[in-house]
């Protein structure tokens, strides 16, 4: 791996300081090299661009998105190499968190690859929040036995999509149960020495509404594929019956003239925004405040909009390779690493 631009800048600065010190030494017989040592050491420790704090390793908890399902358009096929978090395919365009960490510190970071993926990516298609504790328990066991450090440096978590996708609005996972299951998973991480000090990266549920919006004009998606996708409370009767295009593109607002299907989809959207994501955010903050998971962070990606290219053309629902690239970029830039990354838009 090549050194990152940040590390190159630091090395160049150290070299220049050493060069200046050497030049001055040649013109001053009584000057001792030790006089310049503090400056050289300071340069070595200098964080010129706030280097990325790279975890020792990265584990993943999730559902079909965490498996990269249908990322290449093949229905039902997992593509762990393409996943936004732990993906490892250097030839795709995703540039996952795993690849970013590897590029930042190849020597220290225990990167994911094809051989290590079964240990590091525990996402399972169809997983709901009730599976969080199960996947967390697997990670505790694996981190303790299968990593050089014996601990999980970082755990990425994106769950809840299958709790909100349901046959109807009334059959979405009960928010009380959703919170109980969420706490059970967090408790597993908080109560193990392998994960209690890990960087816990909890993502919000994305705005799934935009997956419908991206493909609702596609005949194949609308009439052939979506009847078999288990998210009927969003995808049933998928034609657009919103009052107008302005209404369709503003799912946070119900307009006069919106049809019943449009209102149902906007209600689905609002419940994620107003009920499920606040649970993910507020409960995690509680664990932070109580020092149970002091390095836990909530990453809100609900305002991220998926366009046509971000949704695969096979099942017309899961993120494509471009969709995972979008997620990786947004998750990176909205976390602590993006604060000083010049490639992250303000």
What are these regions (language model features)?
Residues 3, 9-14, 18, 22-95, ...:
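N-terminal secretory targeting modules
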Residues 52, 68-74, 132-134, 166-171, ...:
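Short, solvent-exposed loop/turn and secondary-structure capping segments
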Residues 55-58, 90, 94, 129-132, ...:
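Solvent-exposed, acidic/flexible segments
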Residues 57-69, 118-123, 153-159, 163-165, ...:
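Structural recognition of the beta-strand scaffold that forms the well-ordered cores
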Residues 64-67, 100-107, 135-146, 185-193, ...:
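Structured segments of extracytoplasmic/periplasmic soluble domains
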Residues 74-184:
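Conserved SGNH/GDSL esterase-like catalytic core that processes O-acyl groups on lipids
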Residues 194-198:
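A short helix->loop->beta-strand "cap" motif at the edges of active sites that frequently abuts
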Residues 210-346:
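Catalytic His-Asp segment of secreted/periplasmic serine-dependent ester chemistry enzymes
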């Amino acid at each position: 791996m090549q050194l990152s631009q940040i590390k190159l800048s630091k090395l160049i600065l150290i070299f220049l300081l050493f060069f200046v010190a050497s030049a001055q030494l040649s013109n001053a017989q009584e000057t001792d090299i030790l006089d310049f040592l503090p400056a050289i050491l300071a340069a070595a420790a200098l964080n010129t661009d706030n280097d990325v704090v790279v975890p020792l390793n990265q584990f993943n908890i999730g559902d079909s998105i965490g498996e990269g399902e249908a990322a290449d358009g093949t229905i039902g096929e997992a593509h762990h190499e393409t996943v936004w978090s732990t993906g490892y395919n250097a030839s795709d365009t995703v540039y996952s968190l795993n690849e970013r960490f590897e590029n930042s510190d190849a020597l220290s970071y225990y990167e994911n690859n094809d051989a290590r993926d079964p240990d590091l990516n525990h996402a399972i298609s169809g997983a709901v929040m009730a599976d969080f504790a199960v996947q967390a328990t697997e990670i505790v066991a694996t981190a303790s036995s299968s990593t050089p450090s014996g601990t999980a440096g970082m755990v990425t978590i994106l769950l809840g999509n299958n709790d909100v996708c349901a046959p109807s609005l009334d059959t979405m996972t009960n928010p009380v149960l959703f919170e109980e299951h969420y706490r059970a998973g967090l408790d597993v991480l908080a109560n193990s020495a392998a994960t209690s000090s890990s960087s816990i990266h909890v993502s919000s549920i994305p705005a799934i509404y935009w997956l419908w919006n991206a493909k609702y004009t596609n005949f194949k998606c609308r009439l052939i594929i979506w009847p078999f996708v288990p998210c009927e409370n969003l995808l049933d009767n998928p034609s657009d019956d919103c009052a107008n295009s302005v209404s369709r593109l503003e799912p946070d607002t119900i307009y006069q003239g919106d049809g019943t299907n449009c209102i149902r989809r906007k209600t689905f959207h609002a419940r994620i925004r107003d009920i499920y994501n606040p649970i993910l955010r507020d409960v995690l903050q509680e664990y932070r405040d109580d020092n149970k998971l002091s390095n836990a962070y909530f990453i809100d990606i609900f305002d991220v909009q998926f366009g046509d290219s971000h949704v695969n053309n096979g099942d017309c629902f899961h993120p494509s390779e471009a969709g995972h690239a979008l997620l990786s970029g947004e998750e990176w830039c909205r976390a602590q690493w993006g604060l000083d990354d010049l490639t992250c838009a303000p």
